[in-house]
Amino acid sequence: MFSLRRGDRARDFCTLAEIYLRICFREEEPFLAEVFSRIAPLIEGSGVVFGSHADGTADEESDLDLFVAGECRVEEIERIGRVYGFPIHLTIYPREVFDRDLHTDPFLPEVLRNHVLIKGAEHFVEKAAR
């Protein structure tokens, strides 16, 4: 079994792993990759897909669960969902609330357990590693 000591190097490896997962997900799901590329510029902070699309159980009736730690342009993101034919369910935490409550909020472990980061990997990893 391998382990990493906490520090800059460990955070860098974890950030690279998150980016690699995003690349793999985009290759496996080109339709969602296009959606992500339109949503990412509308987010200031970290954008995280979780739920059925992240764990591979989504079907044609599934919405896209998107968590934002920071700010985003809600109406534009919802419009993108309508254009592509599925609802986008947004959960938004101001960055300071995410930073403070990451390990105490009962909702956030679901996001941490199974997710695909579409933006802001460094901040997300830095806070999750604490």
Label for each model-derived stretch:
Residues 50-52:
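Glycine-rich beta-strand-to-loop/alpha-helix junction loops that act as flexible
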Residues 1-45, 54-61, 69-130:
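Catalytic core of pol beta-like nucleotidyltransferases
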